[in-house]
From Swiss-Prot:
This is UPF0262 protein PHZ_c2197. InterPro entries: UCP032146 (IPR008321). Belongs to the UPF0262 family. It holds the Pfam family UPF0262.
């Protein structure tokens, strides 16, 4: 992807809807902030019909649907996605992450690596699904989709 396209179509801000967020631990809040920072550092985000960015994104959950409010120069749209196709992936991702964090404390490096590979594989699968679900609405690269999936999970974290 050309650097020019990456500069023209990028997110400049990301906000998670406060009403969609549950109270979480300090570690989970830090993970949210890191995910947003990483997303803003490097992303490709090209809404269909928008000439150029940068864009502001607000993410939230409404009636078990993902709501993406996107604003940019001459562009303002709300995209709503059903989360049903993601339910199993989100559940499995949380389970493998919990196992991974427990393994860090008690397991061998080989066991930790195996769990980490599984976690990354699930993350990739969910990211590819997100790209498919956004087709015709918003184009992203895989890394941007991965970071967006992390934030979708952040909206589902419960304390």
């Amino acid at each position: 992807m050309a650097d020019d396209a990456r500069q023209k179509h990028r997110l400049q801000s990301v906000e998670l809807d406060e009403e969609s967020l549950a109270a979480v631990s300090r570690d989970q809040e830090q993970e949210r902030q890191i995910a947003i920072f990483d997303l803003l550092e490097d992303n490709y985000f090209a809404p269909e019909g928008a000439e150029h960015g940068p864009y502001d994104l607000r993410m939230g959950l409404v009636e078990n649907r993902l709501v993406l409010d996107v604003r940019g120069p001459g562009y303002e749209r709300r995209h709503i996605l059903s989360l049903s196709p993601f339910r199993g992936l989100i559940r499995d991702y949380f389970m493998i992450c919990e196992s991974y964090y427990q393994a860090i404390r008690n397991s061998t490096p080989a066991q930790i690596e195996a769990l980490d590979m599984g976690r990354r594989g699930l993350h990739n699968e969910a990211s590819e699904l997100l790209q498919t679900r956004l087709k015709g609405k918003i184009e992203t690269d895989l890394d941007t989709a991965r970071r967006l999936f992390t934030l979708i999970c952040a909206l589902h974290w419960r304390g």
